[in-house]
Structure formats: structure tokens, C-alpha cells
From Swiss-Prot:
This is Large ribosomal subunit protein mL51. InterPro entries: Ribosomal_mL51 (IPR019373). One of its GO terms (molecular function) is structural constituent of ribosome. The gene is MRPL51. Keywords: Mitochondrion, Ribonucleoprotein, Ribosomal protein, Transit peptide. Residues 1-31 form a transit peptide. GO terms for biological process: mitochondrial translation; translation. Belongs to the mitochondrion-specific ribosomal protein mL51 family. It comes from Homo sapiens (Human). It holds the Pfam family MRP-L51.
Length: 128
């Protein structure tokens, strides 16, 4: 009976203690979660397109006589190029720039999102 209590309750009590700190009275540590062999090395393509193009535009100013700004080389929506901000600012900027050309449902959903974020930012956060 005492052995069962010690193995059940004692194990739960000392389960969080690191292996190096356990005393020998608790028994041999379990080796269930410990890896005994090294995992096989991952095969990684070091010259895929993303890695090959990393840093390709870093010297565009030096080599290109500073004619192009790096933000002009960014691909993506026009309202996001070379700009950063939170979601509310991003939605307001999108509505201002392309709101007149959006479908009615998309514009309605964007306006709903702006209303929700406006309420959220005014009720929660550090600067209320």
C-alpha cells in the first residue's frame, strides 16, 4: 500500500523537478521523453528562390546612383507599399485609396471592420 502511494503521489509531486535535481530515493528517472539517438539531418535546398534572392536589393542605391527607393521595389497592394501601421490604420488607408473601386459587399465588410476596430481601440489598450 505504501509503495503504491509513494509511486503514485510521490511521482506526481516530484514530476516537475528536473532530472539533475532528483534524489536517489525517488528511484531511477523515466527515460520516456528523452531522445537516445540524434534525429536525421534535414535536407534543405539552400538555393531555392527565396534564399537566392535574399538581400538582392540591398545595394540598389549604391549601384543604381540612388535613383530608386527600396519601397518602389516591393510587390504588393499599393496601399501597403513602404508603409506600416496597425490594422485600423491599414483599413482606413485601403478605404481611402481603393474604396471607390471596391465591390459593394467588400466595401460594406471593410466599413464594418473599421467600425469594430474603432470601438475596440477606443475601449481597450494603453491609451484610452
Amino acid at each position: 500500500m505504501a509503495g503504491n502511494l509513494l509511486s503514485g503521489a510521490g511521482r506526481r509531486l516530484w514530476d516537475w523537478v528536473p532530472l539533475a535535481c532528483r534524489s536517489f530515493s525517488l528511484g531511477v528517472p523515466r527515460l520516456i521523453g528523452i531522445r537516445l539517438t540524434l534525429p536525421p539531418p534535414k535536407v534543405v535546398d539552400r538555393w531555392n528562390e527565396k534564399r537566392a534572392m535574399f538581400g538582392v536589393y540591398d545595394n540598389i542605391g549604391i549601384l543604381g546612383n540612388f535613383e530608386k527607393h527600396p519601397k518602389e521595389l516591393i510587390r504588393g497592394p499599393i496601399w501597403l507599399r513602404g508603409w506600416k501601421g496597425n490594422e485600423l490604420q491599414r483599413c482606413i488607408r485601403k478605404r481611402k485609396m481603393v474604396g471607390s473601386r471596391m465591390f459593394a459587399d467588400d466595401l460594406h465588410n471593410l466599413n464594418k471592420r473599421i467600425r469594430y476596430l474603432y470601438k475596440h481601440f477606443n475601449r481597450h489598450g494603453k491609451f484610452r
